[in-house]
Amino acid sequence: MIRAEVDSANALGADDSFDQGMPVSFSLKQNYPNPFNPVTTIEFSLLQGGMTDISIYDISGRKVESLLGRRLVSGNHFIKYNASTLPSGMYFYSIVVSGMNGESLFSSTKKMVLMK
């Protein structure tokens, strides 16, 4: 079950740019607000398009959510995550971007805190 919303002019699950300028590098920004309850925003930039996976992990490293798993174009993107069914605690969100041939283009992980 996916409990994420990628804001878009397209259907739920599509991508949207939050800035018209093109990024100069790949990046995963800190979610905001942080701590959050229960919705937070995760922004990320893709220097080039690719298969983009974003997942949420608990403190023990167990994957608790897959937020995104689709090909996105280069640009600046954001996703809103609703963690209403998860207990309070520290979580990690991770992005992995792969190229056309499956090669790793970018990966990063950041910490977030859910406080209910």
Where are these regions (language model features)?
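C-terminal tail/sorting-segment detector
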Residues: 66, 74, 80, 84, ...
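Ordered hydrophobic segments in well-structured contexts
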Residues: 1-4, 41, 111
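Glycine-centered coil/turn sites that cap beta-strands in beta-rich domains
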Residues: 15-32, 36-56, 73, 78-81, ...
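Short, compositionally biased serine/threonine- and acidic-rich segments at solvent-exposed termini, linkers
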Residues: 1-19
